[in-house]
Structures are given as structure tokens and as C-alpha cells.
């Protein structure tokens, strides 16, 4: 086995602004050729714009707050999750996240795939 790349430490102050979606603040911690990881914040009573993650599979861990995920035909599939819960978003699934609560939500997001990590769209198909 050859020499591996060194282990990296990315403290909060070294995260960089991630891809923009209205209503969300993404902070990129790690981006490699096939993986993206970061921290996402959504303000109280905000809802993100509709988007998908191209060819990426996405795993979302809710650190704090309440998250309302809308997806499916006309956005009619709705899931609410809280601290300790995970979401799985398959490649190409159009969705948006909302924060119905009174406190900012904090999420850890990890994506595996290639191509654009965020594609903003007008809305889901009917």
C-alpha cells in the first residue's frame, strides 16, 4: 500500500461558502472528486428553493431544529425530522427543505457522486 494523503482537520472557521440555494446557507468542509461534506443552516420559518443534487446521493443528519422535507409529485411527499434523524435523498430527487420551527436548523450533509452538487430548479414535476 502506498502513502496515503494526510488526515485533515477542518474547524468551523475554515469552512467555505457552499453552493447557494435561496433560504439556506451551506458551508463546505470537504470537496473531493466524488464526495462533498458540509454544514447547512436554515433560519427559523424559512424554506429553501427547489433543487436537486444531480448524480449525487445525499445523506443529511439533523443536528438541531426541525426540518420539513418536501419532494415527490407537486411536492406532496412531506417528512418532518428532528435532532438525531437522517434523511436520504436519491440522485436527481427534486426537493426543498423548510424550517417550521422558531430556531435555526443545523444539518450535517454528505454527498457522494460527481458533477454539479446543487442544481436549483423552478419546482417539482406534477
Residue positions per predicted region:
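A short, N-terminal "cap"/entry segment at the start of jelly-roll beta-barrel domains
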Residues: 1-39, 118-126
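Short, conserved beta-strand element in jelly-roll/cupin
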Residues: 41-43, 54-69, 110
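Histidine-centered metal-chelating micro-motifs
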Residues: 47-49, 68, 87, 91-97
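Short acidic-glycine-tyrosine-enriched beta hairpin
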Residues: 75-91
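Residue-level recognition of conserved beta-strand positions in structured domain cores
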Residues: 39, 52, 71-73, 99, ...
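Short strand-connecting beta-turns/loops that link adjacent beta-strands
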Residues: 33-34, 55, 74, 102-103
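A short hydrophobic beta-strand segment most commonly corresponding to one strand
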Residues: 59, 88, 103-119
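Conserved short histidine dyad/triad with adjacent acidic residue
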Residues: 21-22, 38-54, 91
Amino acid at each position: 500500500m502506498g502513502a496515503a494523503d494526510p488526515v485533515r482537520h477542518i474547524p468551523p472557521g475554515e469552512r467555505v461558502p457552499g453552493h447557494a440555494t435561496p433560504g439556506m446557507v451551506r458551508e463546505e468542509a470537504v470537496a473531493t472528486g466524488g464526495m462533498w461534506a458540509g454544514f447547512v443552516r436554515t433560519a427559523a420559518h424559512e424554506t429553501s428553493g427547489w433543487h436537486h443534487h444531480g448524480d449525487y446521493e445525499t445523506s443529511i443528519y439533523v443536528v438541531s431544529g426541525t426540518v420539513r422535507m418536501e419532494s415527490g409529485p407537486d411536492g406532496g411527499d412531506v417528512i418532518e425530522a428532528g435532532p438525531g434523524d437522517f434523511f436520504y435523498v436519491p440522485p436527481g430527487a427534486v426537493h426543498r427543505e423548510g424550517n417550521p420551527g422558531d430556531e435555526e436548523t443545523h444539518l450535517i450533509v454528505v454527498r457522494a457522486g460527481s458533477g454539479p452538487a446543487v442544481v436549483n430548479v423552478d419546482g417539482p414535476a406534477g
